[in-house]
Amino acid sequence: MERLHSKELTAVQKNARDVGDEIHTDRHIIDPVAYDMLYLASFGINSRGKAAGQSKGQNNGINILPNSKPDEKCLERYRTNEENMKALCRMCARHFIDVLVGTTLKQAGLTLPKYWEDRIVKAVRKALLFDVERKKLCVWMDSEHIWYLPLKGIVLKDYYPSVGMRQMSDNDILFDAEAWERVEKHMLSEGYEAESVGNGNHDVYQKPPVYNFEMHRSLYGKGHDERWVEYYSDIKNRLLSDQPEVVCDAVHGASENTTANQTESVNGGNSSCGYHMSDEDFYIYITSHAYKHYSGNGTGIRTLLDFYAYLNAKEESLDFDYIQTECRKLGIRDFEKRNRRLCWKVFSSQQIYDRVSFEQSLSADEMEMLKYYLSSGVYGTFERMIENRMEKQKKTDGRGKRSKLTYYRHRVFPGMELYENYPLLVKHRFLIPAYWFYRIVRMLFSKKRRNYMWREVKAVKKVTAQESFNEQSNC
């Protein structure tokens, strides 16, 4: 597969290997285990805990359930039934919320099996190791006067009740692109391996036992929506400084809605060159990032939970006129509104344990969106990636239905968005036909690439067959 999609593919393959692809939701109703996961997650995310910037004894608008124990009918399904417990753990792991749900069960008095307890311990340990290593990196960047902006999970984790509840696989940090060589040299000197440098818009560094940093030179790049690339091309000018009195070759000032405690929590207390977005801009960014995955491989319940956690703390103070104006520019206004409405319905103070009533409370559009989240898993699925690619191609070509032939043609002869990752091909376009030949030969002599090709062919057949079946069913 091309470098443009290599990270997404790796995540999809890892997700399938770890928890299996066979878990899915019924076409008409929500799977009982999936419903229990949502029900228990709503208790976990609303449980008492210290959210970002929240002092002891303060609520800060956090929605806390008056009765924090789930219904006994739900708990009884997992108290003594090992198969039910295993199915729930696998479902939660697939969506990367097994720590949140497992902790909720423990707090309700259930004894977790060892394999689930081990996952919680490892997740908490990983979160603590990430925090220490990230602080070291930020201190070094401070000393080098390299500006940086912690992204996504680094910020969102502080809106969850306790350490490790918001599980993370890596640390995403935007930094001064002009300093990439210094950053690479430093990471290598610290024992990291450069898994990918100079490909796409971020560099990937990994080190045992768990360390994984994605150092972003830009928020979006080649292959992403051009509106997003342009919108975030001047992001530096819209950032706010964690310490406004210190200048690190960037513009910044403190967010009105961001507390000193939150800033310290995000950047480890040493943030002279650290930056953050305003609350509104951060929300817009995570919405665009969520939509990137939602419309690509798909994305799971953790994404919806992230939105609830953030909105639960911030919604009353957010300027939604500004948010909707900016989301319209990015082409994600409809997604933002639908997503915001759904996360509240799924996670806010849900205490009545009744799957049928819950399903009836959702509109047809909300039900379809929720089932899409449930069927994707945290990293999406391979078939979802193929389906969304074919749908995008159908719209681009103005066709009435998905075409296998058109899909294969674009895969063998991809557009310029792929070639732009190869400076030689951009400069000497006459070499592109030779690259086509090289890709075909490389596939013939690589078992891994041949296996991937056959897997893709099967997925394309399945997607087109499902479309034909749906058309016949609607006749």
Predicted regions and their residues:
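Conserved NTP-donor binding/palm subdomain of two-metal-ion nucleotidyltransferases/polymerases, i.e.
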Residues: E2-G57, G61-S169, F175-C475
